[in-house]
Design a protein with these regions (language model features):
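Glycine-rich, acidic/polar active-site loops that bind/position phosphate-bearing ligands
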Residues: 1-193
């Protein structure tokens, strides 16, 4: 039950939502990926597990309708993330630390051969050749659109070097919650390539 319920009442079932089924583009062997609802096995019928995030969103949408607050809720998250050329961490008995590096970062301006280094906090909407990850982000967006997730745009962000944003189109709350999982999955796996 993954910690959602006490052992004495832990019988659950996963009900797939066939509308979310897709072939995983990152698996060499064809693999079906699907989202669904976690249900507590109960009599006379199963009931939604009230701690499961997807069920919480669906219950919130139903509550909104039942109370005549609105028929639907549209949301628009922005997915901001970093892509680094190097990232590391260390834990020793007397210290803990991490380090990150991005070739286009201003602190690499003295390195030979880089040429296109972005000044501190001047990343916002930079173009090629300064934007070294344009192709990667475009690939992310194309993969998302193949899955039916419409993308408004993507661009470098103003913050630290290697900070980016992908913004989907406005969407219904429960659909956007499902899309959020897929967007994060696509960002992570495309960046890993």
């Amino acid at each position: 039950n993954y910690g959602y319920a006490v052992v004495e009442k832990s019988d659950m079932v996963f009900i797939p939502d066939l509308d979310t089924a897709m072939i995983d583009p990152y698996c060499e062997i064809p693999t079906l990926s699907i989202t669904g609802n976690a249900m507590v096995i109960d009599y006379p019928e199963n009931r939604p597990l009230d701690q499961y995030p997807r069920n919480i969103v669906l219950a919130a949408e139903q509550y909104m309708k039942d109370c005549d607050i609105a028929d639907t809720m549209l949301i628009l998250p922005e997915f901001e993330f970093h892509m680094f050329d190097q990232a590391g961490w260390s834990v020793t008995p007397d210290s803990i630390g991490f380090s990150v590096d991005c070739e286009q970062a201003y602190w690499n301006s003295a390195n030979q051969g880089l040429g296109c280094v972005v000044p501190h906090q001047k990343n916002y909407h930079i173009a090629k050749p300064f934007d070294r990850t344009y192709e990667c982000r475009s690939e992310m967006c194309l993969e998302l659109e193949k899955m039916g997730i419409e993308i408004k745009y993507h661009h470098p962000e103003v913050g630290a070097a290697g900070q980016f944003e992908i913004e989907p189109m406005l969407g219904q709350m429960s659909k956007m919650a499902d899309n959020t999982m897929m967007i994060k999955y696509i960002i992570h796996n495309t960046a890993l390539k």
